[in-house]
């Protein structure tokens, strides 16, 4: 807003979303934590989640677009990098389509979470009323 922009675009990609899935899985999570990184979160948009890191690098190289990587990405000091550099490559040897498969899995988990959220919202609209500052919950049968 300070510079006249309504949103900020971040270059997270499909591999980042997969890493987030595994980080949340390792920490212990519910369904929402297995939905990876979301395309929109408030004023943050992530327009590259459809593409893998490799696809983005290939595109940048083919079109002469400079690419920089944070040197901390090579350190296994961080859980994300341990997953990126250790676990994911092993899973890719087991299934070369791992990135696409995980993208589809994350998409299905996201759809399930959205469905649950809609169901809860419907139940809340039907069962919860507020009048004169008093909240009433009517059990449904």
Task: Give the residues covered by each predicted segment.
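Glycine-rich phosphate-binding loop signature in dinucleotide/nucleotide-binding domains
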Residues: 1-6
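Catalytic subdomain that performs nucleotidyl-dependent activation
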Residues: 7-11, 16-105, 109, 136-140
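Acidic catalytic cores of enzymes that act on phosphate-bearing nucleotides/polynucleotides
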Residues: 113-141
């Amino acid at each position: 807003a300070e510079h006249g922009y309504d949103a900020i675009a971040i270059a997270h990609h499909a591999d980042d979303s997969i890493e987030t899935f595994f980080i949340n899985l390792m920490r212990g999570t519910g369904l929402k934590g297995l939905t990876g990184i979301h395309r929109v979160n408030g004023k943050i948009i992530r327009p590259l989640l459809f593409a893998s890191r490799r696809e983005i690098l290939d595109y940048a190289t083919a079109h002469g677009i400079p690419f920089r990587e944070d040197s901390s990405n090579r350190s296994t000091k961080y859980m994300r990098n341990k997953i990126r550099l250790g676990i994911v490559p092993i899973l890719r040897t087991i299934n070369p389509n791992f990135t696409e498969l995980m993208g589809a899995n994350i998409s299905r988990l996201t759809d399930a979470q959205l469905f649950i959220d809609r169901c809860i919202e419907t139940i809340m609209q039907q069962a919860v009323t507020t009048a004169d500052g008093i909240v009433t919950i009517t059990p449904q049968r």
